[in-house]
Amino acid sequence: MDFRHSEEQLAFYKSVHDFAAGVVEPGAHERDVEGRFDRDLWSKLGDFGLLGLPVPERYGGSGADIITTCLALEALAEGGHDAGLGLSVGAHVTIGTVPIWLHGNEEQKKYLPRLTTGEHIGAMAITEPEAGSDAASIKCRATRDGDDWILNGSKIFITNGSIADTVIVMAVTDPEAGPGHGVSAFIVERGTSGFSVGRDLDKMGTRSSPLSLLHFDDCRVPHANLLGTEGSALWAIAFECFDWERTVMIASSVGGMKASLRASIAYAKERVAFGKPIAHQQAIQHKLADMKAHLDAARLLLYRAAWLKQEGLPHQTEASVAKLFVADAAMRNAVEGTQIFGGYGYIKEYPIERSMRDAKLISIGGGTSEIQKMIIARGLLEEH
């Protein structure tokens, strides 16, 4: 079993890390404080080739495999110290762009070149005020009217919602089909009549990425914008893309864990207490050791899940195991890092404070930790 990445992948990781350190990290603190998404920075990510990684080159992407895509998001997080930006990139790629690549017809794939270059931003709208973890209970309706569909309903907690140029909207087209069935996906463009942004939500962490409330009031969408097969979108499109989302999402978390550990080591060597650097204190050494163990285990679980998906092998349980563990490990490391920094870890001038607020998202977004446990248990019971 070879755990090494290829020389090309390692060189790519370094190039993304260095780019992020030089372009993304400056201003990360200010973007967090202001809760501001930076469109100019987004364009630079597009120019660097980070916004269409897995999409084939003929559509403007890089044709990268999922492992390389994860490496890019890990490096972006480690070098850039901006979890919000990483969240927006991950959502744009995995649930805003990949569904059009995998399920769109050739006419619909006209959206891809603008998405992969960063000219446009993508999002997916599933969650509703009364349908979060229970995605099968969505109420947003789409009714056929000649060559159009009329959408009515609201969506909440939509990453990139207020900045997206295209939103893939899940809506019920056959209410008689039962929960989880009769759901279709529609590509809705910014500016479509009846589509509006309610407001952006004020978040604890990942604050440079907008999280939005969206409204669809008699929103008329052409039938040509129906993505995939009518009535099968929740299972065929959404749940498939959740595998992409969860894996890439935790890659960003692993990159953040690496950055926190490095910062904690550096601070422990510099901070003097009782006449010597606190790195000489066994209590601090134990915290650093725990952080390293959590990081290495998280990274191995991440790339096991990514490798299984890349090889076309069963991976849903392993992806949920990885997300469940990384959610806990990222939070534990953020707490330990903050404790090492002491009082300085509690003030906003130091990135370690931001890491704790950012880390909490992983146990909630993209499927809560409780949902991951349900998926894992279901897989175990089916296997045995």
Where are these regions (language model features)?
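Alpha-helical interface subdomain recognition
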Residues: M1-A83, H103-E107, G118-E119, R144-W149, ...
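Long, acidic (Asp/Glu-rich), low-complexity accessory segments flanking structured domains
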Residues: D217-A236
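A short, Trp-centered hydrophobic/proline-enriched beta-strand micro-motif
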Residues: G118-I126, M170
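Flexible, small-/acidic-enriched active-site or ligand-binding loops
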Residues: S137-K139, G191-R220
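Short Ser/Thr-interspersed hydrophobic loop/turn segments at strand-loop and sheet-helix junctions
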Residues: G49, L73-A77, A171, V188-S193, ...
